[in-house]
Structure formats: C-alpha cells, structure tokens
Amino acid sequence: MVVHGRSGGLVPECLSSLIDDLQAKRSAPVQLQALTAEECPYLPDRPILLLPLLLWPGCHARHDVPAIRERLRSDGAKVTMLPFLGAWPLWWRLVVSSVQCQLEPDSVLVHHPLREGVADRFLTMLSASFSLPLVSFDRWPEHQTQHPDARPIPLALAPNRMTESLYQVDGSPPLLEDPLIRQGLLDLLAFLP
C-alpha cells in the first residue's frame, strides 16, 4: 500500500491500524510505503500487488507511484499495480453514502489542491456524485469569507494539515475516522486478489 504520509515518513495511526487489520483479515503480509519515507524493501519471494491509497489523480498517482513500480521491477519484483483508490467507483459510493448521512445546511466538500486539466473532469464528476459543491483547500478561505456558515467536509483519508485546519472551523474528521467508511474500505481491500 502506498500512502502519502507526513513529514519524515510519519504515517497516521488510522492508516497503520487499517493495514494491521487488513493483514489479519487477509492472513497475508501487507507492507506500507509512505511517499514521504525512505524506500521500503520488498519481499523477493512474493509477487507484489501495489495499491496507491490516494484519492486524487495528481502527480503522486500519475508519476510517483509508477516510479515505485518501476523501481520494484528493476529490483526483480513481479509487480501488479492497481488504480489509485480515488479511481474506484465503489469507494466513492461508500463515501457518498456516509457523507449523505452527516449533511447539514451549507455543507461543502473540501479537497486537496490539484492542477487544472485531468483533475477538472474528475472533480466535476465527484461534485455531481455528492450533489454538493467542491472547493479546493487553497480556495477555502475565500469561500468561507463569502459563505460564513459553510460547514467543510474534508475529503482526506487521514489527518493532515488540511483536516487539522478545517477542524478549527467545525469541519468533519478525516474519512478513515468514520467507522462505516473504515470498515467498508477494509472489506473492499480484503477482497482483492
């Protein structure tokens, strides 16, 4: 599993505990690689299923994770890479159903800033799926000024600077801190080959 991680390769507890639970549920080793950490060694006697636990079609999903795949292959590993988590329709259905249960007037989805282009179509589709406005975190202060009653729902798997900042203005917790979303993701991951 590839995750973004925090400075120095730190991985939030909700991600490391998810990996521990997944390992127990699958009865198979699951390694965690944070993009912010040193490269982790692979188990040479096993094929690797590489899954980016990333929500957005940004540079990490399009460039960094394929580079990890190529590094592993050049080290002799047999690697199958799955699409990043945000490309899974079942994942978003799970998130949409959970978010719909906690909606309040003036709810707005807040996402990690992305470059224009490929992400635009993705974000338009996502906004339509939720039937909610979607605001980039770098535009949140302006949105909040124009809509002082807006209640942010951060679209982030784990705690990060965005979720911590939005929590100060009554934002929802990260997605993996919602028990239904966490269990749903665990079930989805357990059924992978």
Model-derived regions: residue spans:
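Active-site-proximal alpha-helix that buttresses catalytic centers in soluble enzyme cores
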Residues: 1-193
